[in-house]
């Protein structure tokens, strides 16, 4: 019998590898779910900011007596969005967060105070 040998046996190494494999199998899906969850949170925050900006813009036009129609440019400038990539056209605002893309729509496309307020919503294709 050799005394003073240090190290791990093959069985001990296999047990450690199996434990690491189990931990990885549990941790990776949790990490991916957290990434999606944080991206959804960012999108919900931006949506809330856009809706608030839309309401403030509509109210300020009523108070100021302005009846001209407004569009996404006015809403986005009023929202002062930072930290995410986004583009917008006449009807759709598209943003990317965490590698996921979200789209919001303005309806009607030419809201006009004081009679025609706009609604910002997620189309049916947007999944949370």
What are these regions (language model features)?
Residues 55-128:
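Periplasmic/extracellular, small/polar-rich flexible segments of pilin-like filament-forming proteins
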Residues 11-17, 38, 43, 55, ...:
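Generic hydrophobic-segment detector
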Residues 20, 36-40, 72-80:
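Short alpha-helical interface patches
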Residues 2-35:
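N-terminal single-pass transmembrane signal-anchor helix
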Residues 38-64:
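Membrane-proximal N-terminal amphipathic helix
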Residues 7-10, 29-31, 43-47, 78, ...:
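Generic N-terminal initiation segments characterized by hydrophobic and/or small/turn-forming residues
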Residues 2, 16-19, 44, 60, ...:
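Short, flexible coil/turn micro-motifs enriched in small/turn-prone residues
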């Amino acid at each position: 019998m050799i005394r003073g040998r240090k190290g791990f046996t093959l069985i001990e190494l296999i047990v450690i590898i199996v434990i690491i494999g189990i931990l990885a199998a549990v941790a990776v899906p949790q990490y991916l779910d957290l990434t999606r969850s944080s991206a959804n949170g960012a999108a919900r925050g931006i949506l809330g900011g856009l809706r608030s900006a839309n309401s403030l813009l509509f109210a300020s036009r009523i108070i100021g007596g302005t009846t001209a129609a407004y569009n996404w440019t006015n809403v986005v400038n009023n929202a002062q969005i930072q930290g995410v990539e986004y583009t917008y056209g006449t009807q759709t605002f598209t943003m990317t967060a965490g590698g996921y893309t979200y789209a919001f729509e303005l309806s009607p496309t030419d809201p006009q105070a004081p009679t025609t307020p706009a609604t910002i919503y997620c189309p049916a294709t947007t999944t949370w």
